[in-house]
A protein has these predicted regions:
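C-terminal soluble interaction/assembly domains
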Residues: 605-653
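C-terminal accessory/binding modules appended to enzymatic or scaffolding proteins
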Residues: 358-386, 580-615, 619-624
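Bacterial N-terminal signal peptides that target proteins for export
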Residues: 1-9
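Conserved catalytic motifs of ABC-family nucleotide-binding domains
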Residues: 285, 397, 508, 621
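Short, conserved beta-strand segments of beta-strand-rich sandwich/propeller modules, principally
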Residues: 319-321, 430-432, 542-544, 652-654
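Serine-dependent protease modules
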Residues: 22-264, 269-280, 290-319, 326-363, ...
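Bacterial N-terminal signal peptides
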Residues: 9-18
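Short, low-complexity, Pro/Ser/Thr/Gly-rich segments in the mature regions of secreted, periplasmic
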Residues: 664-676
Length: 676
């Protein structure tokens, strides 16, 4: 069969199209393979224990994020919001190996942090680290293929593919993304992309087709992701690794885009009081056209981070020549940059006050409209604590200026004075405190020091029968075909090894009288009547209990015994380092948990929600069977063992606990620098 020209052309085009599709599929898989091969083994999953002030105390929390190894000695780049407040860091490598890491430095202004793996802790036969290299983010263009890598939701490493959709993405609302008081958008213009970003991907690399890092993923909003450009990330991470911090200059200039889009330069929106810019004579409304000889311009908000990078990147103490316009007149200003302080200092906890507090920085003192940086600023207040209970009570933002007549210029003054006041005291000490709230100068009295010892009621001398009961209400007596005038109780449970069990009382027995005296219980609110009647006897007394069993008369003589010590009278121990409390097992604990009389264990009475014990997984009600393999059934032995472990700074404390019908091992790995 001969083909006409039209058929031949059609078949040829179809063949070419099929060939191109096949070639496209092959070629499209190559970038992914290369990117994965180059970078995937360098991805780490980061498990972090962080600490920050809230509710009057330093709260610990667990979180996960991602990072990427960038050096042979184990430097890992991630986000500040992942690890910037870390007290303990564990990195899981692509092959499952777990390595502890330390924080070298963190920068909230760019949301970047650098970790260093504890390489000496790795096994001698461990594989060499795979490292990823930074590319040039200035060469990235809209439409470029990219790969977002990380460990979403704390799972294993993953890769998603997308394209670059924006090379100068900023937050639509100025100052909407803040870390430690710093506006991240002041310096960062994200690379926008549509590679899917899941929770936990933060800190992972954004990679190009050649396998180079072009960004560090930071945010995911719907289907849009944002990555910190690699050029900025590389520069900041190198300085963090070397110095542990970023040194930036400060001028007091606050600029915005020009109002007239046809005009060059930037508009001065404001000048901070007493700043280098104010001293140079720059005023709001002036136009800046050149900064240190470099032409500057901002017609839209996306242009501002470029200018801010230039300003903050100058050496501290450098003389800067600025040219521009002031009221349409050409001007040249000269200023000397000063060192930029962080927006806030790290908060500290004062347990005896129920507060977290912090020092002022230059900017935080200016924001608070203070003339200097003296005083200790209240960061958070715990409900029920000493500061919350004072009248007037302290609130966040208050500035403590003196304690007991002693001036407070900084947090360390407050700590020192407090230690002097409470030293050797066993009760809270009412202390006069001077503080400022806005423009008001106030006084209050705060009772600081150890908590008052509770006056626990003594019950151990009282007798008991060893049963639980329910009142014979009118409804019950009618259902049991008893006379309507019947009063008494029904035995719901007989506890083991008790006077009731020894005397032969059984569950289901109906009791109407004790030694001939009617048990005046016939309403739900009469639940205490039976117990109160027994309390009238002395331990060792013989009492006759009369009633019915299976519709037959029942009379049983019972020798009442001393009531076992209730839970609130048993020895307990509050472990302050790891923040949990244990006590010895009560009779009720053994009954409820079906434990034998001599079965060892200590019950956890309380676990602070932010302590190391909580992070290890201990829960209120857990039964501690062993600590590091040792059985400890007495509180004094437990206290001695815990003090020994703390003194030795044990790297690992393993609790073998019983939870319901299950047993499990819980591992506590303290960060001793943090707990001391």
């Amino acid at each position: 069969m001969k083909l006409n020209n039209y058929q031949f052309i059609l078949i040829s085009l179809t063949f070419i199209h099929t060939f191109l599709l096949a070639e496209s599929k092959v070629s499209s898989s190559l970038p992914l393979a290369q990117a994965v091969e180059n970078v995937y083994p360098a991805i780490v999953r980061i498990e972090v224990v962080s600490e920050q002030g809230s509710g009057g105390r330093m709260m610990k929390s667990r979180s996960t994020g991602s990072g990427v190894i960038v050096s042979k000695d184990g430097q890992v780049v991630t986000n500040h919001h992942v690890a910037g407040k870390a007290t303990r860091i564990t990195c899981r490598l692509h092959d499952g190996e777990e390595v502890l890491a330390d924080l070298l430095g963190a920068d909230p202004m760019t949301d970047l942090a650098v970790l260093i793996l504890r390489m000496k802790d790795r096994a001698p036969d461990s594989r060499p680290l795979t490292i990823a290299n930074f590319g040039n983010s200035d060469q990235v263009e809209i439409g470029d293929v990219c790969f977002a890598m990380g460990s979403p939701a704390g799972l294993s490493q993953s890769v998603t593919r997308g394209i670059i959709s924006n090379v100068a993405l900023i937050s639509p609302n100025s100052g909407s993304f803040r870390l430690d008081g710093e506006n991240v958008g002041e310096l960062v213009r994200w690379l926008g992309h549509d590679a899917i970003i899941f929770p936990g991907n933060s800190g992972g690399p954004l990679v190009d087709e050649k396998g180079f890092i072009i960004g560090i993923n930071e945010v995911g909003i719907g289907s849009l992701g944002g990555a910190i450009p690699s050029n900025l990330a590389d520069q900041v991470s190198q300085e963090l690794a070397q110095n542990g911090m970023i040194a930036r200059s400060w001028t007091g200039l606050e600029c915005q885009p020009v109002l007239d889009p046809k005009e060059d330069g930037l508009l001065v929106a404001g000048i901070i009081k007493d700043s280098p810019a104010e001293k140079a004579g720059i005023k709001p409304g002036d136009i800046i056209k050149k900064y240190d000889g470099k032409k500057v311009m901002a017609r839209i908000a996306e242009d501002l981070p470029v200018f801010n990078q230039l300003v903050y990147g100058m050496k501290v103490g450098k003389k800067i020549k600025i040219s521009g316009l002031s009221k349409e007149k050409k001007m040249i200003w000269t200023l000397t940059t000063s060192s930029r302080e962080s927006a806030f200092t790290k908060e500290s906890e004062l347990k005896s006050w129920g507060l977290t507090i912090r020092n002022f920085t230059l900017m935080s003192s200016l924001e608070a409209r203070r003339s200097d940086k003296e005083g200790a600023q209240v960061h958070s207040v715990g409900r029920g604590g000493a500061s919350y209970s004072a009248k007037p009570n302290l609130i966040p933002g208050d500035v403590i200026t003196s304690i007991g007549g002693n001036p407070v210029k900084a947090v360390n003054d407050m700590v020192r004075i407090t230690n002097i006041i409470i030293k050797g005291k066993e009760e809270p000490v009412p202390t006069l405190v001077s503080f400022e709230r806005d423009l008001a100068q106030l006084l209050t009295v705060v009772k600081i020091g150890p908590e008052s010892v509770e006056n626990r009621p003594v019950q151990a001398w009282k007798p008991w029968l060893g049963v639980s009961t329910q009142v014979l209400t009118r409804e019950l007596t009618e259902s049991l075909n008893l006379p309507k005038s019947t009063k008494g109780v029904r035995i719901a449970e007989v506890f083991p090894r008790t006077p009731a069990e020894k005397a032969g009382i059984q569950a289901g027995d109906l009791l109407f009288r004790i030694d001939g005296q009617v048990i005046q219980a016939y309403r739900s609110e009469d639940a205490e009547v039976f117990g109160n009647m027994i309390k009238e006897y002395k331990p060792g007394s013989l009492a006759l209990f009369s009633g019915l069993r299976h519709n037959k008369t029942l009379d049983l003589n019972v020798t009442l015994e001393k009531r076992p010590e209730p839970a609130n009278e048993l020895p307990n121990y509050e472990e302050e380092t790891f923040e949990f409390t244990v006590r010895e097992l009560s009779f009720g604990d053994r009954v409820n948990q079906r434990l034998q009389e001599k079965e060892p264990g200590l019950i956890i009475e309380n676990v602070e929600p932010a302590g190391w014990a909580s992070l290890a997984g201990l829960r209120q009600g857990d039964l501690i069977l062993k600590v590091n393999g040792k059985t400890l059934s007495k509180v004094e032995l437990f206290e001695w063992e815990m003090n020994r472990l703390i003194k030795d700074k044990s790297k690992q404390i393993v609790f073998f606990v019983k939870r319901g019908i299950h047993t499990l091992f819980l591992e506590l790995e303290p960060d001793w620098d943090d707990t001391q």
